[in-house]
Amino acid sequence: MNIVVAGTGYVGLVTGACLAEKGFCVTCVDVDEKKVEVMKQGISPIYEPGLDEILDRNYKAGRLDFTTDYESAYQKADVVFIGVGTPEREDGSANLDYVFAVCEQIATNVTRDVVVVLKSTVPIGTNDKVEEFFKENKKQDVRIEIASNPEFLAQGTAVIDTLHASRIVIGVESDWAKDVLTSIYQCYGQPIVVTNRRSAEMIKYASNDFLALKISFINEMANLCEIVGADIEEVANGMSFDPRIGNKLSLIHILTLPTN
């Protein structure tokens, strides 16, 4: 199985490196030639503990490659993971230009049936729009199936978050896409949650929002504890024994998370 990863930022590079670490043959595509040459030396362009070692080990083993030649990469691809950025526009909406630029490259160059997987955080319904884009723009008579596979990583722990994920969410609309992604992720040994694409997109936003809600709540409780002379860690510990609220570790962890 030839896997291609579009984009070598936090999401794309960590995804590609970890797939190679699991034994898959992976080609990471980026438009920046200097960046590609640096990665071929086993040096990550982003700081992430453990990533340099994974890049170096798997590049030398021949499981991981880096290229700017997207035409050749997509022609040989069986699965393409899209992990490019979706920066915020001035009006607050997500800029999907990079996503659709990659889709244009895939549509122009793909020569075989392929599963295209969106790892990037995108608005609800984007996978459906990508599917329509391929129907209208693909150059060859091939099957292109779209899947949503949101990431749940954090900077500084991205490698651990990927290799030891709490769960792997797969949003699909066909048995073929489900079978392909399940066959890839079963070696991770983590729970695989299979949903439709819109549910997978929503799981990403709902998870982020719920965590933000918990952080806001515990911060307010910390402020109140300071006013009344209580100890927030003792309060969190006392709350944690209630199974409806959560365990001690998760509550104390939230106390240490940055608020920005």
Question: Could you tell me what each predicted segment is?
Answer:
Residues 1-255:
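Structural/interface elements that position substrates and couple domains in central-metabolism enzymes
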Residues 256-260:
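A short, hydrophobic C-terminal helix/tail in secreted or cell-surface proteins
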